[in-house]
Every structure is written in C-alpha cells, then in structure tokens.
C-alpha cells in the first residue's frame, strides 16, 4: 500500500504472485481474509457477514487507535502527499527500512521518527504529515479507520476473481484513498448517484404488509408466531450474499442481467462492504431494496434456507425445530405467491393507509428485524397455549403454527452457541461439502436428468399426495373441541357435527349415541381433516398429561376420500401436535379392520408404558386389541417420508459418484453357480478400491484399561495445552471477536471443552480424542487464511500432537 497513487487515479501495487492468491500485500501485514462477496457461490450464500474479517479489522483498528500519536502519524504519512516542495510529486511516505517479514502486530514495530527520510523523495516524514499537526485525536482515529479499510479493500481487489466485484472493490478503494488525502468523508457517487432507498415499498415493509394482509385476523398469540417467522426471514436477507452477475448470467441467461448488476453493485457498496469497512455508511438490505431484488433471490434463497434448516435441525430446541421445519416452509410458500404475483396488494404504496382503516394492528410495529445476530434462525422459540374447547388449535393450523405470548419480552435463544454447537461427528462420515454438492443437484430441477417429475411416481410415500394438497391449500387440519365455558363457535359446531357423521358412517358397529357423546365431550378433542370447507376425516382423542399418554378413540376418513394418504398424514399431524405438548405415547383399542392401519403408523402390540399408568383411564373394548405407539420428539413426522426419500436419493448419487471414480470393471462372481452359499466380503474383486475397510482387521493399539487410557490422554492433552502455539485454541471462539464463525464452522472444538470431556470420561477410545483434537486444527485452517498466524499455530501444534501420540504408542510410528 505504500506505493499507492494520488487521489485522482490511485495506482495499485503489483498483484501477488500467481501461485499465492491469498498473500496479503498490505503495509499493516493484515491477516484478514477478503469480504464475503469473494466466496459467493453460484446461487448466493447464507454465510455470516464478513467471514470473520470484520472482527479482525476491528481489533486492528482498536490497536492502532490506542497507539502513540507518532505511530499514528507514521501510518497516515504513508497515504499523505509530500508538502516539502511544490515540485515534489511523492504521494506517500515510504519507510526506508521496511521490515523483511510482517511482524506479529503493528504495535510491535519500531516507531519511526518524524525526521526519518522518505525512501522515494528523501523528504522527512514531517513534510508528509504537516497538515495533521493540529488535527484532533478523534479526527485522526477516523482517518486511521479509513486507512485500514483501504488496505483491506486493496487485498480484496487482488484476491477477487470476478470482474464485476473487483471493479466495485477498486472503485471503493479509490474513494476511500481519496477521502484520506482530502480528509473528507467517503460519499458514493458516479453511476450510483441514486441514494437509498432504491425501491418503495422496501422488502421490510412488504413483509410487514404480508403479515398484516394474511394474518391480521388471527388471535394475537398466533399472529405473534408469524411475526417471529417474518423476523427470521428478514434477518437472513440482511446477511444473504448475492451471487455475482457473471455467475447469475451462467445460471439464468434469460434474466435481466443489467438490472440485477445495478442492484448487485448497490448492494456491495451500501450493504455488504460496509459490514467489514465501517468507514462507509451501512444500510440494511431489507430497508433499501424492494420487490425487484427480492424476486431475483427468493427462489434459490428459499431452497437453501429450508435445506439448511433440515441439516441443522438437531441443534435446535424441540419447540423451535417444530416451528422451523413445519411452519417456516408454509410461511415461505405463502410469501412466494405474493412476491411473484402481479397484483399482490402488499407491494402497493398506499397499503399502509388502507390497512390502518381495517385493522387495529399498527403496521409500523409489526416487525422490527434485528441485525445483530447471524444465526440462521434467530427468532426465539414460542410458548404453547392450552387449547380451549370451541376454538381451533393453532398447533395444527397450516398458516400459523405455534403461538407466542404477546407483550412478553423473549430472551435471545442462540441456537448456534458454542456449547450447543459442539456435536460429535461420526468417524468416517461423508464430508459436508460433498453432501451439499449432491443436495444442490437433487433439489435443482435443472441439474437433474430424466423425465419430468410433475406426477407422483409409483413408489411415492403414502402421504405425499396429501402433503402436496395441504401445501396448495386444498386440505386443512384443525384441532377442535366442544366447550362448556364459552359460547360455541358456529363453524366449530358444524365441524363437530360433520365429525360425528363421518365416524358414525365409517364405524357402523359403534353406537351413534356413544360417538356423539365423546365427540362433543369437552375432555375429548378431535383433529379434523377439512376439504372444501367440509369434514372428510378425523381422529378423536383424549389427552392424559399426568399419565404421559393419549387415548385415540375414533379414527376414520370418508370412504370416497380413502387411499389418498389422508389417514397417514392425519396421524402424522396428530403426532406433531402431541410432541408440541410433550405427550409421547399413544394408546388405542383397534378392531380387526384397523390393526393394519395402526401398524403402518408405527403402532405395536408391545405397550411401552407401565400398565399402572393407563389401567382405569383408557376405555376397554371387547374383541379389540390394545396397541401403542411411542413418539420420537426429534422426528418431524409430517416431513418424515420426504426426508427418507431425500436420503435415498443422496445415497444413490453418492454411489453413482463412487462408481464413476472406479475405472476398472471386474467380471461378475461365478462362485454361486458352483453351489457356494456365502463368501467373505473382502474376497469380492475390487471391493477395497471402493473405500470399503474390514471392521475387524484394524487392531487397536489403545490401552484396554480405562484408567491407563485416561492417564495417557490426560498427559497428551496437558502437553498440547502447554505448547507455546496453543494460545489461540484454549477457549471457545467468541462471537464478538469473530462474527460469522459459527456459520462457517459447523462443529467447533477447543482445548477447554476437551479438558471438560476428558474429566467427564467422555473419551472411551483414542478415536474420539483424536477426532476432537483434529477438529480443532481443521476448523482453524478452514476459517483462517494460510498466511495467518492462527493457521501457522494450528500446523505447528498439529505436528506436535501427532508426535506425542506416536510416542505414547497410540498410532504406528
């Protein structure tokens, strides 16, 4: 950076050598990687802001601002023109004795005297900074902040491969360089003369309008849940990384690239780059862009968000998992219709005034999305309402879902906190990158070969057709019940009568009076299946929370609507409803005609709960068989068949990839023709080349005595912690120091956590211990650039670790 040109057209120093694109050529020796736009995937990414670069820049700025004034003047002199003589054309002071290698930090460098001569013009440093003699510390700190931003952008210019992005980086580089020379504030001009907001209504206002338009009629608790979903969506847009125009041109050649390029440039200048260069004013994407940008990213963003949600579901609390996996897809589908609709009212300029006349809800206060966190789903989990008879339960309502108490301040629930995110990974697992690559193929219709899949295949899941109908709004599910405490709702009463008729018609051996008594009993509830406004099926049940089970009394679907998957989907909704209410056991008496159905839904004649729990509570039926079903709270039952299908597709694609890698083809086995019934797997020709390993062949070297293993691992871990290069890995990475770290690193690990695990006797084998410590090094190298000090520490410590486990005899030397 010491060779930078003047204000009008700064000349960049030569680019790093071809073989080292990540080499940083800044005067400060920054180890920060470039901004998030440098690693944009072909369809955009949902990574956290700055990729950790913003934290590193903030640390360097704090260090520099706390330095002595002489050090600050030296730094600013590099970017200040010489004023000794009018004829001197030197644009920046050059240190005559530059360090041969970048030191560990700026503050460790020797402070240069103001009388030190410039290597270029031979004038003193004082001649370059004479205009800064009477400048306040506050102004000097502001200029120093711009200096570090310039150096960071300089790195980005050289590292960026996309021409459009590089051009924007270079423009901002020149803008900030000029601001330093002229001591002014950077103002984006030129082709970007239009100032934010660029379109009205904004994305935030449009989503506000959408919530008002679609959900204002709901009770406050149900509406609050929708608001939480909207907050999650807006938060993700604010940290969404747009794909470069060149990538979009390849993916969608028929799109309006010129319009997208304009929005992309604005997004870089006003939203993205200011995340890590805070000398530029920053705007939230949702506040300055509108429908046009949202349309260009919504489809791919929706797909990736849902996929990421499914991948991270195990990290989420039960309530939030149900909210995200069950209700977030429905929310996005409804919003998608309004985004691409030509006449949706949510994008009208006068929607605010029109809605204020019809709704008591203040549209301005519906959603106020925070831009403080980068977790994928930052909305807090919500509480549940005990269902009152005579009203529909939001627990199974497709348009809303869970409820949250209005007016109650919810604490931030960091689902990606370090403690929660520490998940052990199975040894030999398939790399996440490969899974994501396969997922992008099987979820992208353009990437799949073969016939169209508009129609259901012969091997579709039983509930697939019903699930599709629910998404299209053809069918609905509502938990209903009678009430003695309040005036019954007319619609609910009509549905209860409809349920009575369905049960009576489909269960002719059951007395009609008995059916009527139970359906209208306030202690019983019914999950009703509604199609075209009328009841076509349902499951009547009674919950016993104190006993930990629910009794299923009636279950039926009208005869002309059977064999469509409604029964399976109905039961899956009932399972998810009970998971929300933390009741994980079903009991029912099934007659000879119903046993087959209940077996398909996971029921068994083996009852898992003690007999004392249900005797005297459940109704006994002569000639019927008692069956039970235990629910797994980690399974999203309404999407379970989709997940299984997706897993099968992934395995199939992975097998195809492996087959393509194996060039040699072996003849088929002929031994079975000779009467051989069985052969060892390892004797199959080519089996080892596929990556298969015999489980019994690897002789473990680890000590058989648990105490001996504990002592050995404790000794190794202590030596690793005492190593001089172990300092970056002693504690979990803090979010404040590295924003976006837990978006990049899925399985964090540190030496403190390992010490706790060792103390709790978690490491029952050497493999678990080695996997955790290897994860420490892998995470560091994945997040930090190769030339950074953290990366070097990880490499040195990794070699030391392997030398120690070899000395301990845990692996072959």
Swiss-Prot record:
InterPro entries: Acyl_CoA_acyltransferase, Bromodomain, Bromodomain-like_sf, Bromodomain_CS, GCN5, GCN5/PCAF, GNAT_dom, PCAF_N. GO terms for molecular function: acetyltransferase activity; chromatin binding; cyclin-dependent protein serine/threonine kinase inhibitor activity; diamine N-acetyltransferase activity; DNA-binding transcription factor binding; histone acetyltransferase activity; histone acetyltransferase binding; histone deacetylase binding. The active site is at residue 551. The keyword Transferase applies. One of its GO terms (cellular component) is cytosol. One of its GO terms (biological process) is positive regulation of glycolytic process. Disruption phenotype: No visible phenotype. It holds the Pfam family PCAF_N. Acetyl-CoA binds at residues 555-557, 562-568, 593-596. Its EC number is 2.3.1.48, 2.3.1.57. Residues 704-808 form the Bromo domain. Residues 406-423 have a biased composition (Basic and acidic residues). Belongs to the acetyltransferase family. GCN5 subfamily. Functions as a histone acetyltransferase (HAT) to promote transcriptional activation. Has significant histone acetyltransferase activity with core histones (H3 and H4), and also with nucleosome core particles. Has a a strong preference for acetylation of H3 at 'Lys-9' (H3K9ac). Also acetylates non-histone proteins, such as ACLY, MAPRE1/EB1, PLK4, RRP9/U3-55K and TBX5. Acts as a circadian transcriptional coactivator which enhances the activity of the circadian transcriptional activators: NPAS2-BMAL1 and CLOCK-BMAL1 heterodimers. PANTHER family: GH11602P (PTHR45750), HISTONE ACETYLTRANSFERASE KAT2B (PTHR45750:SF2). This is Histone acetyltransferase KAT2B. It comes from Mus musculus. The gene is Kat2b.
């Amino acid at each position: 950076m010491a060779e930078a040109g003047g204000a009008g057209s700064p000349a960049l120093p030569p680019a790093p050598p071809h073989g080292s694109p990540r080499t940083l050529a800044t005067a400060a020796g920054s180890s920060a990687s470039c901004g998030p736009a440098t690693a944009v995937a072909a369809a955009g990414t949902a990574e956290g802001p700055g990729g950790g670069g913003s934290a590193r820049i903030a640390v360097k700025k704090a260090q520099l601002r706390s330095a002595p004034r002489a050090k600050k003047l030296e730094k600013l002199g590099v970017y200040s023109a010489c004023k000794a003589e009018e004829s001197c054309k030197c644009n920046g002071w050059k240190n005559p004795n530059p360090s041969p290698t970048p030191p560990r930090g700026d503050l460790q460098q020797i402070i240069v005297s103001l009388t030190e001569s410039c290597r270029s013009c031979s004038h003193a440093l004082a001649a370059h900074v004479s205009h800064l003699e009477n400048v306040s510390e506050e102004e000097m700190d502001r200029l120093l902040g711009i200096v570090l931003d310039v150096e960071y952008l300089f790195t980005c210019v050289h590292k960026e491969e996309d021409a459009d992005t590089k051009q924007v980086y270079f423009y901002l580089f020149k803008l900030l360089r000029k601001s330093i020379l002229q001591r002014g504030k950077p103002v984006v001009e030129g082709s970007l003369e239009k100032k934010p907001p660029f379109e009205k209504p904004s994305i935030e206002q449009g989503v506000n309008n959408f919530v008002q338009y679609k959900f204002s009629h709901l009770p406050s608790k149900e509406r609050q849940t929708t608001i939480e979903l909207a907050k999650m969506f807006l938060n993700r847009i604010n940290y969404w990384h747009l794909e470069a125009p060149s990538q979009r041109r390849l993916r969608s050649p028929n799109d309006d690239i010129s319009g997208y390029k304009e929005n992309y440039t604005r997004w870089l200048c006003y939203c993205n780059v200011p995340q890590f260069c805070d000398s530029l004013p920053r705007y939230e994407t949702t506040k300055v862009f509108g429908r046009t940008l949202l349309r260009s990213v919504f489809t791919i963003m929706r797909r990736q968000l849902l996929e990421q949600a499914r991948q991270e579901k195990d990290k989420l609390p039960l309530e939030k998992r149900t909210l995200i996996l069950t209700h977030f897809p429905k929310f996005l589908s409804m919003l998608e219709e309004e985004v691409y609709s030509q006449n949706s009212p949510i994008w009208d300029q006068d929607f605010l005034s029109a809605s204020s006349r019809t709704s008591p809800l203040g549209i301005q206060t519906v959603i106020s999305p925070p831009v403080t966190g980068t977790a994928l789903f930052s909305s807090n989990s919500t509480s549940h309402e005990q269902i009152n008879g005579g009203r529909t339960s939001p627990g199974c309502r497709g348009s809303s879902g869970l409820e949250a108490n209005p007016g109650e301040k919810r604490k931030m629930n960091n689902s990606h906190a370090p403690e929660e995110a520490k998940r052990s990974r199975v040894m030999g697992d398939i790399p996440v990158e490969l899974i994501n690559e396969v997922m992008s193929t099987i979820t992208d219709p353009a990437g799949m070969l073969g016939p169209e899949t508009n129609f259901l295949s012969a091997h579709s899941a039983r509930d697939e057709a019903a699930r599709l109908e629910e998404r299209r709004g053809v069918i609905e599910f509502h938990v209903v019940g009678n009430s003695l405490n309040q005036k019954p709702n007319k619609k609910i009463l009509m549905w209860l009568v409809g349920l009575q008729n369905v049960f009576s018609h489909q269960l002719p051996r059951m007395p009609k009076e008995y059916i009527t008594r139970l359906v209208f009993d306030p202690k019983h509830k019914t999950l009703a299946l509604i199609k075209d406004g009328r009841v076509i099926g349902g499951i009547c049940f009674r919950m016993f929370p104190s006993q930990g089970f629910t009794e299923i009394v009636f279950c039926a679907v009208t005869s002309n609507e059977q064999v469509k998957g409604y029964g399976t989907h109905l039961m899956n909704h009932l399972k998810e409803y009970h998971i929300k209410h933390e009741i994980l056991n079903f009991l029912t008496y099934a007659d000879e005609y119903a046993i087959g159905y209940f077996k398909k839904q996971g029921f068994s004649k083996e009852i898992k709960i003690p007999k004392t729990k249900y005797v005297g509570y459940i109704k006994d039926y002569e000639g019927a068989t008692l069956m039970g079903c235990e629910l797994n709270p980690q399974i999203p039952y309404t999407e379970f068949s989709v997940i299984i299908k997706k897993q099968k597709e992934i395995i199939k694609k992975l097998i195809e990839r492996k087959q393509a890698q194996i060039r040699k083809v072996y003849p088929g086995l002929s031994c079975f023709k000779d009467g051989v019934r069985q052969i060892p797997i390892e004797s199959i020709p080519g089996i080892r080349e596929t990556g298969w390993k015999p489980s019994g062949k690897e002789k473990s070297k680890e000590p058989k005595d648990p105490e001996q293993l504990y002592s050995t691992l404790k000794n190794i871990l202590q030596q690793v912690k005492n190593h001089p290069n172990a300092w970056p890995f002693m504690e979990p990475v803090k979010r404040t120091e590295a924003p976006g770290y837990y978006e990049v690193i899925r399985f964090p690990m540190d030496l403190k956590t390992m010490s706790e695990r060792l103390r709790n006797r978690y490491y029952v084998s050497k493999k678990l211990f080695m996997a955790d410590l290897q994860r420490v090094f892998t995470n560091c190298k994945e997040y930090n650039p190769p030339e950074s000090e953290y990366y070097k520490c990880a490499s040195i410590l990794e070699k030391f670790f392997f030398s120690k486990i070899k000395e301990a005899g845990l692996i072959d030397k």
